[in-house]
């Protein structure tokens, strides 16, 4: 196991702890109250901030990913330590997201210091969609790897969470999950050439999504649904309305009924082509990629949903400095958050090697922007 600790990190830890305590003392709302306010369209005390940090947590705390990949205890410990440094209002920690598919026997690469990658299709042939069933995420005997990579980590972090950061259930979205199982290019071809086949694949995938989300949501505070294949960069509005929206809407309805949680929906790339339809899914907050103009997004969705984003994760958060981060963060707030209904974050997951100080700089902007 590789663990790095130095005086610089210790000094940052002490400084961040003091600053976070000062900010917390100035807060007039809890994180849960703040989230509820932005969803309802009420003004919170300040701008909430989400670090969208996953593998970043392991790297920042001095660990190689292979030592964290399936270790819930270590993952929980370093996530809590990381959050003490950054002060994020939300956390989900270092999840090995391809584990969602490993119990199916698909090939998944396992690089030492990066996420695994799904390398093979579960539904390679058309007839596989009907013949090959998926595992039951709520049955521990059928979902061993999914639990090791995702659910066990979520549950372990909740037990040690000392900062009050909000925790989430997690699963890939429906069309993204179907893309992993069928292959994205094959699935997109199915939507055009064999739509009934595409619907069958997505319908089965939606049941897997539902189970994975429910397996990790008990005791949580919100739900996080990344659905990158739903991007307007990949599909058009008509495809989104037919093959993603109705399935996502049904899941969201069920989750809200059973958990009462707010739903954060993240879509990569350009979502402007599908933006007007996204609120129809029933989600509460769209986490927007850095590729879009938040002001344009706000104009399209109005007050139907809250927006989240979208500081450039590479150019600014990873490679920028404190001044660049402050300017970019304020630009995001002014574009979409002057009247509330907004969470400040990166415009996608924070890159692995992003300095803690840069993440902290974004946190400080949100925590100092009061209403």
Tell where the protein language model's regions lie, with residue ranges:
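Active-site loop segments of alpha/beta catalytic cores
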Residues: 20-21, 26-59, 63-68, 78, ...
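Intrinsically disordered, low-complexity segments enriched in small/polar residues
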Residues: 2-8, 103, 114, 162, ...
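Compositionally biased amphipathic helical and low-complexity segments enriched in hydrophobic
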Residues: 2, 13-15, 83, 135, ...
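Conserved FAD-binding subdomain of flavin-dependent enzymes
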Residues: 75
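N-terminal amphipathic/basic-hydrophobic helices that include classical n-h-c signal peptides
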Residues: 1-25
């Amino acid at each position: 196991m590789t663990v790095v600790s130095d005086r610089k990190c210790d000094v940052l830890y002490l400084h961040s702890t003091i600053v976070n305590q000062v900010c917390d003392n100035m807060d007039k709302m809890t994180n849960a109250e703040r989230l509820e306010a932005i969803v309802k369209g009420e003004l919170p005390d300040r701008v909430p901030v989400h670090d969208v940090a996953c593998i970043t947590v392991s790297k920042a705390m001095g660990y190689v990913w292979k030592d964290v990949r399936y270790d819930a205890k270590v993952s929980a410990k370093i996530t809590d330590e990381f959050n003490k440094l950054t002060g994020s209002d939300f956390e989900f920690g270092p999840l090995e997201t391809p584990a969602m598919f490993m119990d199916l026997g698909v090939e998944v690469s396992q690089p030492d210091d990066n996420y695994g990658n799904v390398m093979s299709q579960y539904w390679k042939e058309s007839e596989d969609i009907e013949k090959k069933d998926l595992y039951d995420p709520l049955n521990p005997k059928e979902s061993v790897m999914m639990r090791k990579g995702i659910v066990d980590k979520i549950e372990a972090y909740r037990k040690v969470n000392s900062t009050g950061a909000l925790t989430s259930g997690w699963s890939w979205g429906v069309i993204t999950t179907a893309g992993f199982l069928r292959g994205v290019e094959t699935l997109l071809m199915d939507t055009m050439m064999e739509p009934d086949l595409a619907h069958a694949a997505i319908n089965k995938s939606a049941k897997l999504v539902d189970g994975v989300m429910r397996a990790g949501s008990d005791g949580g505070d919100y739900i996080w649904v990344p659905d990158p294949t739903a991007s307007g960069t990949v599909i058009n509005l008509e495809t989104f309305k037919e093959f993603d929206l109705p399935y996502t809407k049904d899941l969201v309805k069920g989750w809200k009924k059973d958990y009462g949680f707010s739903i954060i929906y993240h879509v990569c790339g350009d979502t402007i082509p599908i933006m007007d339809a996204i609120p129809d899914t029933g989600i509460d907050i769209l986490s927007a990629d850095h590729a879009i103009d938040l002001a344009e997004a706000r104009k399209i969705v109005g007050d139907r949903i809250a927006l989240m984003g979208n500081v450039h994760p590479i150019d600014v958060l990873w490679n920028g400095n404190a001044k660049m981060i402050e300017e970019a963060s304020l630009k995001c707030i002014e574009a979409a958050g002057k009247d509330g209904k907004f969470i400040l974050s990166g415009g996608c997951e924070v890159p692995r090697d992003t300095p803690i100080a840069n993440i902290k700089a974004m946190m400080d902007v949100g925590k100092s922007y009061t209403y």
